[in-house]
């Protein structure tokens, strides 16, 4: 386009002037170039901004997905730690069960040995009936210890009931926590579904934006192609206008030359007409003179002939001289006839040249009329081209207005979508924070409840075993009392063995309680350690 403008300018400078149509076309081409460059820069900036916005959204989505993956990995690690802790707790429970089995085996061995001793002492008691008072005092002491042991067993039973109530309350609390955890898990599942739906909607919106961007790019390409087509059409119109102007100039030059030729021919025609008129007048004068001369000569000849005849008769001797005069007259007549023929040939030639000049004049006038008609047609085509250029300008302005309106609509839609995405990002972040806090609290409470439940179950199992042992011991003591009351003379070694056995059982029960307390403390420490690890991981 610039090359075309430069060519027009150079041709205008070489010609010395620019026509109004060329100036308008040049100004139109400059305006079109400026508009195209401006719109192209605007479209490139807008497309670049849209691409950067889409890249930012893609990066944010990738960051959110990476955070979700990290959270899923942390949850998996926590599940593994919980499974490992459950395995360790199960192993510890198995160890404690094995120890309880060992204790029960020892108790069974002691019972068997006690029964053997009881049988032996009964045999000895049947053979010996001494020191009844000491035995009775020993029995009273043993009964007091048995009462103390019963009181302790009652206290243990009360403590067992308290522990059982605590375990039932903890079990109810665990059930409530389990229900709460199910509710929270359902809420978390709903929130995850909401997050997934939000992600899907954001992805669909991003796809919608990308499709809109592609459509905008397609429209931009279509507009650029339309502008290129219009530019090509304008160039073609410029070329046709230039060719028309060149043809118009050539025809104007031909018209000028033909007008000059016509003027020259008209002058020549005038000259020929004048010369023809002069020659015609000269010929007419010559003809008149010749006619007069011929008439005069004829009259003279008649008179001379008459005279000669008259004189012939009179003067026959003068006959030779009359014959010469007659010859002279005849020669003059021949000369006049030849000159007349020459003049007639010249007149015919001049008439033919006049007819040829008139035909050339007619042809030139016809050519002038045709050229005038062609000039009128060229002016009509030029007006049509100007109207087409105006229409193209209007089309370009309409396309620009429609594109600007569509671009404004796209900008408003993109701003609304960005605001909605920002709000959704805020809601997603708050939901993630609240869900992570609830997950932490729920996991901590569930761990505490599980640990307490395990501890209380173990304590209850141990207390149940102690209660069974106390029952067995109380039954054995009752049997001993019955045996002692039935016997009239108890033996002191039996009381010593019973007191020793009761002291050993009391020590063993204290030892079991201490071990239970140590185990409870150890479980508490482990639960605190796991809670600290979990909080550190979170």
Curated annotation (Swiss-Prot):
InterPro entries in alphabetical order: Cep63/Deup1_N
List of residues that carry N-acetylmethionine: 1
Record note on quaternary structure: Interacts with CEP152 and CDK1; these interactions recruit both ligands to centrosomes. Interacts with CDK2, CDK5RAP2, WDR62, CEP90, KIAA0753/moonraker and CCDC14. CEP63, CDK5RAP2, CEP152, WDR62 are proposed to form a stepwise assembled complex at the centrosome forming a ring near parental centrioles. Interacts with CCDC57; the interaction is required for their location to proximal end of centrioles. Interacts with FXR1; promoting its stabilization.
Domain of life: Eukaryota
UniProt key word Acetylation: yes
GO-annotated molecular function: molecular adaptor activity
Keyword field contains Acetylation: yes
Protein name: Centrosomal protein of 63 kDa
Pfam families reported in the protein's UniProt record: CEP63
PANTHER family: CENTROSOMAL PROTEIN OF 63 KDA, SARCOMA ANTIGEN NY-SAR-24/CYTOSKELETAL PROTEIN SOJO
Physiological role: Required for normal spindle assembly. Plays a key role in mother-centriole-dependent centriole duplication; the function seems also to involve CEP152, CDK5RAP2 and WDR62 through a stepwise assembled complex at the centrosome that recruits CDK2 required for centriole duplication. Reported to be required for centrosomal recruitment of CEP152; however, this function has been questioned. Also recruits CDK1 to centrosomes. Plays a role in DNA damage response.
Keywords associated with the record: Acetylation, Cell cycle, Cell division, Coiled coil, Cytoplasm, Cytoskeleton, DNA damage, Mitosis, Ubl conjugation
Modifications made to the protein after synthesis: Polyubiquitinated via 'Lys-48'-linked ubiquitin, leading to its degradation. Deubiquitinated by USP36, promoting its stabilization.
Gene Ontology CC annotations of this record: centriolar satellite; centriole; centrosome; cytoplasm; spindle pole
Gene transcribed to yield this protein: Cep63
Localisation: Cytoplasm, Cytoskeleton, Microtubule organizing center, Centrosome; Cytoplasm, Cytoskeleton, Microtubule organizing center, Centrosome, Centriole; Cytoplasm, Cytoskeleton, Microtubule organizing center, Centrosome, Centriolar satellite
Family per record: Belongs to the CEP63 family.
BP-aspect Gene Ontology terms: cell division; centriole replication; centrosome duplication; de novo centriole assembly involved in multi-ciliated epithelial cell differentiation; DNA damage checkpoint signaling; intrinsic apoptotic signaling pathway by p53 class mediator; meiotic telomere clustering; negative regulation of innate immune response
């Amino acid at each position: 386009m610039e090359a075309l403008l430069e060519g027009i300018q150079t041709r205008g400078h070489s010609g010395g002037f620019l026509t109004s149509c060329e100036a308008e076309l040049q100004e139109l081409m400059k305006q079109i170039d400026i508009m195209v460059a401006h719109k192209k820069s605007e479209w490139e900036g807008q497309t670049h901004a849209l691409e950067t916005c889409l890249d930012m959204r893609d990066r944010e989505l990738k960051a959110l997905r990476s955070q979700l993956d990290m959270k899923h990995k942390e949850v998996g690690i926590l599940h593994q730690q919980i499974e490992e802790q459950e395995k360790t707790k199960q192993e510890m429970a198995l160890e404690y069960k094995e120890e309880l089995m060992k204790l029960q085996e020892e108790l069974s061995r002691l019972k068997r040995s006690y029964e053997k001793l009881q049988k032996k002492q009964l045999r000895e008691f049947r053979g010996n009936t001494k020191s009844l008072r000491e035995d009775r005092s020993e029995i009273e002491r043993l009964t007091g210890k048995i009462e103390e042991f019963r009181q302790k067993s009652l206290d243990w039973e009360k403590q067992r009931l308290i522990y059982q109530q605590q375990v039932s309350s903890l079990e109810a609390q665990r059930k409530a926590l389990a229900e709460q955890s199910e509710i929270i898990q359902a809420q978390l599942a709903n929130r995850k579904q909401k997050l997934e739906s939000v992600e899907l909607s954001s992805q669909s919106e991003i796809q919608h934006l990308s499709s809109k961007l592609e459509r905008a790019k397609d429209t931009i390409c279509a507009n650029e192609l339309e502008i290129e087509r219009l530019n090509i059409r304008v160039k073609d119109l410029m070329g046709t206008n230039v060719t028309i102007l060149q043809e118009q100039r050539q025809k104007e030059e031909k018209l000028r030359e033909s007008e000059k030729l016509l003027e020259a021919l008209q002058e020549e025609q005038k000259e020929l007409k004048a010369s023809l008129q002069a020659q015609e007048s000269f010929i007419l004068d010559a003809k008149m003179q010749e006619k007069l001369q011929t008439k005069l000569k004829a009259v003279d000849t008649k008179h001379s002939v008459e005279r000669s005849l008259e004189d012939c008769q009179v003067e026959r001797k003068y006959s030779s001289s009359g014959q010469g005069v007659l010859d002279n007259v005849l020669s003059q007549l021949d000369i006049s006839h030849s000159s007349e023929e020459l003049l007639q040939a010249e007149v015919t030639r001049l008439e033919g040249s006049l007819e040829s000049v008139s035909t050339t004049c007619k042809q030139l006038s016809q050519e002038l009329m045709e050229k005038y008609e062609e000039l009128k047609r060229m002016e009509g085509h030029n007006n049509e081209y100007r109207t087409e250029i105006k229409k193209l300008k209007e089309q370009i302005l309409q396309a620009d207005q429609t594109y600007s309106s569509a671009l404004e609509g796209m900008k408003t839609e993109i701003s609304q979508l960005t605001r909605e995405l920002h709000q959704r990002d805020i809601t997603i972040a708050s939901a993630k924070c609240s869900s992570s806090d609830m997950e932490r609290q729920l996991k901590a409470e569930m761990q505490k409840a599980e640990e307490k439940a395990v501890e209380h179950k173990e304590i209850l199992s141990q207390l149940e075993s102690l209660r069974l042992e106390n029952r067995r011991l109380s039954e054995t003591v009752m049997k001993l009392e019955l045996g002692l009351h039935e016997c009239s003379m108890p033996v002191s070694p039996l009381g010593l063995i019973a007191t020793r056995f009761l002291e050993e059982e009391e020590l063993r029960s204290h030892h079991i309680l201490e071990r239970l307390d140590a185990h409870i403390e150890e479980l508490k420490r482990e639960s605190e350690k796991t809670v600290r690890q979990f909080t550190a991981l979170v």
